[in-house]
Every structure is written in C-alpha cells, then in structure tokens.
C-alpha cells in the first residue's frame, strides 16, 4: 500500500519502511508524527480523501548540501560569494 502525503507544501509518495528527508519540523528526535494522507493507493483501487493517518518517526535533524551563490558585476571588481545549507529532518514511515 502506498500513500501520497503533503508536508510543508511538498508531496511525497510513501510506503511503510521508507526513509525520506523533509524540511525541518518542530519535533524532537524519536517523536512519532501523524500525517493525514491525500491519496491512498492499493494494488486494485485508489482512494481520495482516505480515513486514517500515516505515522512517521523522526530519526534526526541535519543540514542539506551546501548551495553556493556567486554574484559578480563585470568591470567593477565586485564579487560576492555566499553559501547556504537548508535544515532538514530525516523521517521513517512506520505505518499507514
């Protein structure tokens, strides 16, 4: 069984046992979160507005890979280099 869930305006197709990286959530490591699915997909049918919740467990909080932003103005000797690392949360899907 699969489910389509929405977390922080992003959609994920998940099934039990999946581990995924989502935008940082205000939860402690080890907490179990309940998320309402948008679509439930069985082998034979698809249910819109399904009943029940998807339970995910917070495994860790971490930062994503660095993205470098480089600005330059030609002939003016202006250069600016900034880096950014997005904060993320790693979760595991427990049950549906």
From Swiss-Prot:
Pfam families: Ribosomal_L21p. The keyword Ubl conjugation does not apply. One of its GO terms (biological process) is translation. SUPFAM superfamilies: L21p-like. InterPro entries: bL21-like (IPR028909), bL21-like_sf (IPR036164), Ribosomal_bL21 (IPR001787), Ribosomal_bL21_CS (IPR018258). Keywords: Ribonucleoprotein, Ribosomal protein, RNA-binding, rRNA-binding. PROSITE patterns: RIBOSOMAL_L21 (PS01169). One of its GO terms (cellular component) is cytoplasm. One of its GO terms (molecular function) is structural constituent of ribosome. Belongs to the bacterial ribosomal protein bL21 family. Part of the 50S ribosomal subunit. Contacts protein L20. This protein binds to 23S rRNA in the presence of protein L20. This is Large ribosomal subunit protein bL21. It comes from Prosthecochloris aestuarii (strain DSM 271 / SK 413). The gene is rplU.
